[in-house]
């Protein structure tokens, strides 16, 4: 059984600064990290490996220069995957979800897999599209919002998905793609032994040409800015007489 778990490198939000002059966001000092939602996907894949015993977990990502960071690679591999595959190109920095999905699908097809697991969304965009688009590109079943994996055999996967007023139990044939929610598990913190062992695990670096993509479409970011702060109107009504109560009610009506 070969399981691919996809992840995205995103800027660490605590390092993002706001320029006071125009409200634009400054990412220059922001380190990259694994998207929080993808940590659940990695954990889910590694838990399945422990249950099955003979499974292989491959971490996979497409992106730009952030994927060249040795510390970032070690962070991923220390969380349990046996191998890492990264597809690197500068244009993937600003790739739209459908282009990211196309690249992931091509890389997964080249690598071979039985099950592909990704997070429900990414910490930066949270478009919640990539998992389903990968399934569409590969023409295989895909389910999003998975909150629990009930069983996995050589041919079938059974999962639970929580909706607003009900819980679905779904069975799909393999190969398949699932996007997991944060409810599925609590990602573990890697041990020192796992961190040291991560440096010995294999890493494959591919280009778009290696997976059969001649060009990578991307969008051009014009500006990323924080929303303008609005001044809050503070109305203080002193006293508890009828006039004050009437004024209080009138102000509430204006808000509603």
UniProtKB/Swiss-Prot annotation:
The record's section on PROSITE patterns has: ETF_BETA (PS01065)
The biological process GO terms on file are:
carnitine metabolic process
Please give the InterPro entries that the UniProt record associates with this protein.
ET-Flavoprotein_bsu_CS, ETF_a/b_N, ETF_b, ETF_beta_N, FixA, Rossmann-like_a/b/a_fold
Any one Gene Ontology MF annotation carried by this entry is: electron transfer activity
UniProt entry keywords in alphabetical sequence: Electron transport, Transport
Under CDD domains, the record lists:
ETF_beta (cd01714)
One Pfam match: ETF
Tagged with keyword Zinc: no
SUPFAM superfamilies in the record: Adenine nucleotide alpha hydrolases-like (SSF52402)
Please verify whether the record's keywords include Transport: yes
Its annotated pathway reads: Amine and polyamine metabolism; carnitine metabolism
Domain of life, per lineage: Bacteria
Q: Which HAMAP family match?
A: FixA
**What family name appears in the similarity comment?**
Belongs to the ETF beta-subunit/FixA family.
Assembly description: Heterodimer of FixA and FixB.
Functional note:
Required for anaerobic carnitine reduction. May bring reductant to CaiA.
Question: Sorted alphabetically, which NCBIfam families does this protein's record hold?
Answer: PRK03359.1 (NF002888)
Q: This chain belongs to which protein, by name?
A: Protein FixA
Which species is listed as the source?
A: Salmonella dublin (strain CT_02021853)
**The organism's lineage?**
Bacteria, Pseudomonadati, Pseudomonadota, Gammaproteobacteria, Enterobacterales
Gene giving rise to this polypeptide: fixA
């Amino acid at each position: 059984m070969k399981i691919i778990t996809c992840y995205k490198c995103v800027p660490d939000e605590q390092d993002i600064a706001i320029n006071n002059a125009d409200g634009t966001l400054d990412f220059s000092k922001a380190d990259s990290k694994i998207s929080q939602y993808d940590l659940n996907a990695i954990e889910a894949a590694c838990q399945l490996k422990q249950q099955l015993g003979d499974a292989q977990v491959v971490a996979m990502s497409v992106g730009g220069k952030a994927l060249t960071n040795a510390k970032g690679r070690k962070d991923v591999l220390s969380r349990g995957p046996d191998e890492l595959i990264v597809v690197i190109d500068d244009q993937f920095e600003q790739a739209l979800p459908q282009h990211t999905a196309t690249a992931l699908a091509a890389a997964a097809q080249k690598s071979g897999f039985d099950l592909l697991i990704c997070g429900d969304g990414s910490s930066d965009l949270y478009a919640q599209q990539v998992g389903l688009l990968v399934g569409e590109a590969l023409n295989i079943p895909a389910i999003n919002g998975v909150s629990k994996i009930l069983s996995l055999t050589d041919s079938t996967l059974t999962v639970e998905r929580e909706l607003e007023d009900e819980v679905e139990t779904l069975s799909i044939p393999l190969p398949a793609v699932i996007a997991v929610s944060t409810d599925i598990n609590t990602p573990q913190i890697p041990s020192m032994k796992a961190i040291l062992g991560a440096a010995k695990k294999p890493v494959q670096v591919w280009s778009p040409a290696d997976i059969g993509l001649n060009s990578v479409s991307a969008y051009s970011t014009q500006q990323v800015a924080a929303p303008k702060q609005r001044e809050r109107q503070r109305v203080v009504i002193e006293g508890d007489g009828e006039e004050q109560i009437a004024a209080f009610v009138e102000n509430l009506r204006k808000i509603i």
